[in-house]
Amino acid sequence: MDNVLLHAEGLCKTFALSKKQQKIEHTGAKKRVAVNHLSFDAMEGEIFGLLGPNGAGKTTTLRMLATLIKPDEGDAVIGGYSVQKEAEQVRRKIGFLTSELRLEEFFTPNYLFDFFSDLHQVPANLRKERKKHLFEIFG
């Protein structure tokens, strides 16, 4: 459990602001810094959360880690693979689900629990126990 699964070092991302955005935000700045030299480690088996107010760069950070956008500076290594140099291998190691995703009606919590249990080869007896426990907590 002491293994570093994700190592982020100096991640930076800026976005250009359109003239309309500059006017709305009453700024003359042509760029917005979304992520500014972010570094952290997440260990194998650890539950890790990114917390912060709206606009703090959480989603931008996750998009960089998921190789959906490239960092302007810095790099992250996930499972031994660089998000900058080995994006395809990183995508094979991770899954990324945003709140914007809309699932079909047949993707019920029960269906999704069974699907991911199958995917990760969770034994039937353990699956039943975990499902019962989690469904009691979350409904």
Which ranges hold each PLM region?
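Short hydrophobic beta-strand immediately N-terminal to the Walker A/P-loop
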Residues: 48-50, 62
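Helix-to-loop junction immediately C-terminal to a conserved catalytic motif
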Residues: 66
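Conserved ABC ATPase "signature" region
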Residues: 114, 118, 125-139
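Walker A (P-loop) phosphate-binding loop of ABC-type ATPase nucleotide-binding domains
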Residues: 53-57
